[in-house]
Amino acid sequence: MKVHVPVTLVMITLLAGCAAQQQSRREVQQNQQVLYMNETYETLNQNLEAEVKSDQVEVKQLKNRLQVTMVNEILFPEGGWEVGPHGIEVLMKVAPSLENLSGKRILVQGFTDNVPVDETLRTRFPTNWELSASRATNVVRHLQAQGIAPSTLAAEAFGEYHPIASNQTPEGRRKNRRINIVIEDEEM
């Protein structure tokens, strides 16, 4: 019995050391993730400085994720769904920050205002759901074309159902017509 006590104590000490080492690794990984998100936030703000100053783009650092919000007019022609030349330039400024992501996913979210889709487009987009989905998907395609791994990309459509401003004013509707690019942990 006396032999078992020292062996048990050695085992407990080893297990405690392993647990502490695993905790330390997790803390290092979390700190690296925070540093990565901070660096990405700073880079996005620098790359998009003109667009941020003109109130067309907003970069937010939220808990465990980053969000780049772009009003539609910077990406798409009036009433359009295909990324225009200026939109391609803006996405080229965003793409370098999205390369080489490890353990992250990129959600491209499309939103509209509550104005019904114009009659001329209703055969293609019966509702704002389809319009917001097409816009988000086109942004995903452009990011992929710029080298972003397709396995990290996803498109989401919200239509008119998540406004951030009142749809009663032109300025509110402008803010509601937007694309969000969200960078978050894969397991979220």
Where are these regions (language model features)?
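Bacterial N-terminal signal peptides that target proteins for export
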Residues: M1-V7
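Bacterial signal peptide processing site
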Residues: A19-Q22
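Post-signal-peptide N-terminal segment of Sec-exported extracytoplasmic proteins
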Residues: R25-Q30, L35-T69
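Periplasmic peptidoglycan-binding/anchoring modules of Gram-negative envelope and division proteins
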Residues: N45-S54, V68, G79-G110, N114, ...
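Short, charged, surface-exposed interaction patches
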Residues: Q56, L62-L75, I106, G110-L121, ...
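Periplasmic OmpA-like peptidoglycan-binding domain that tethers envelope proteins to the cell wall
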Residues: G80-W81, P85, F111-M188
